[in-house]
């Protein structure tokens, strides 16, 4: 059915997996000078260059807008920390106060135009997600604290969607796009629907603690990759795919390492681990 799926059943999760790894790979490339061994450093440079070129050539072909947004946000964070773009921006604002407002207005217009273009690229798909999110919020309102139970989303969604259509509030476009999805295509809404606000807050607490640890240890690649995965999860269902869950566990585990340990042990070993994950995911399909 699909020509470009990698080790996955469709291009979406494949693109999301690549988008999640890319910021970490970018960080490895930017800090290759910290590796003392000459041959290991050359190997890292070669692997990173090949990997990034392959990723950048594959991602556009997947037509996954969520993955595009994820890789842009995750990589932007890594680059901003490595090149201290925030400090450079403050200096620019201080030196060119008159140009600040027009520059930000132009940037805002560019971002708005980009978002509109991405929306109309696959309009029906975007409208379908909006419908799923709307119906999922109805489930959360009906079961706010403990949700419908793990694995109960599909049945609850069918009932909530039927009630929404019976109410007469649905548009013709929504009736045309209606389906019976197994996922909310937004992991945060999905978690809230199945485990309630209590489960969602516990999950958000884990994420906040992990981000704080990673940021404190200056692990920009981990923060970037985790940000990319969470961005992708706002538009897809990565937590229902074991490869993405394994990647999430690896990223959360890396958040607690100190910076020296990260440089000494993770830089090259993590590339090997991720390669093994990709190989096993292909063999187990």
State what each model feature region is.
Residues 32, 216-217, 251-284:
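A juxtamembrane structural motif centered on a specific transmembrane helix
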Residues 2-4, 110-113, 120-124, 137-142, ...:
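Transmembrane-lumen/periplasm boundary regions of multi-pass, lipid-linked membrane glycan transferases
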Residues 59-62, 146, 155-168, 231-242, ...:
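Membrane-interface helix-loop junctions at the exits of transmembrane helices
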Residues 118-157:
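Aromatic-rich transmembrane-lumenal/periplasmic boundary elements in polytopic membrane proteins
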Residues 1-5, 150-193:
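Interfacial juxtamembrane loops and adjacent helix segments
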Residues 115-131, 270-285:
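Hydrophobic alpha-helical transmembrane segments in integral membrane proteins
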Residues 153, 223-229, 271-274:
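Central hydrophobic cores of alpha-helical transmembrane segments
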Residues 1-2, 6-119, 193, 197-222, ...:
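Alpha-helical transmembrane segments of multi-pass inner-membrane proteins
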């Amino acid at each position: 059915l699909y020509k470009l799926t990698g080790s996955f059943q469709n291009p979406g999760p494949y693109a999301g997996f690549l988008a999640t790894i890319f910021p970490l790979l970018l960080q490895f490339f930017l800090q290759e000078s910290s590796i003392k061994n000459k041959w290991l450093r050359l190997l890292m440079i070669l692997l990173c260059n090949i990997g990034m070129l392959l990723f950048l050539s594959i991602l556009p072909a997947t037509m996954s807008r969520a993955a595009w947004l994820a890789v842009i946000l995750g990589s932007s964070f890594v680059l901003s920390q490595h090149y201290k773009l925030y400090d450079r921006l403050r200096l620019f604002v201080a030196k060119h106060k008159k140009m600040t407002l027009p520059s930000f207005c132009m940037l805002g217009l560019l971002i708005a135009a980009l978002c509109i273009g991405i929306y109309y690229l696959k309009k029906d798909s975007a409208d379908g997600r909006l419908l799923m999110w709307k119906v999922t919020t109805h489930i959360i309102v009906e079961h706010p604290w403990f949700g419908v139970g793990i694995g109960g989303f599909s049945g609850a969604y069918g009932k909530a969607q039927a009630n929404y259509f019976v109410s007469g509030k649905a548009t013709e476009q929504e009736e045309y796009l209606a389906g019976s999805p197994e996922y909310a295509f937004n992991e945060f809404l999905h978690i809230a629907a199945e485990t309630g606000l209590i489960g969602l807050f516990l999950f958000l607490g884990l994420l906040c603690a992990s981000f704080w640890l990673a940021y404190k240890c200056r692990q920009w690649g981990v923060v970037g990759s985790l940000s990319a995965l969470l961005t992708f999860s706002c538009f897809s269902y990565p937590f229902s795919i074991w490869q993405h869950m394994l990647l999430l566990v690896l990223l959360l585990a890396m958040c607690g390492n100190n910076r020296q340990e990260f440089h000494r042990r993770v830089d090259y070993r993590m590339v090997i681990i991720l390669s093994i994950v990709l190989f096993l995911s292909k063999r187990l399909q």
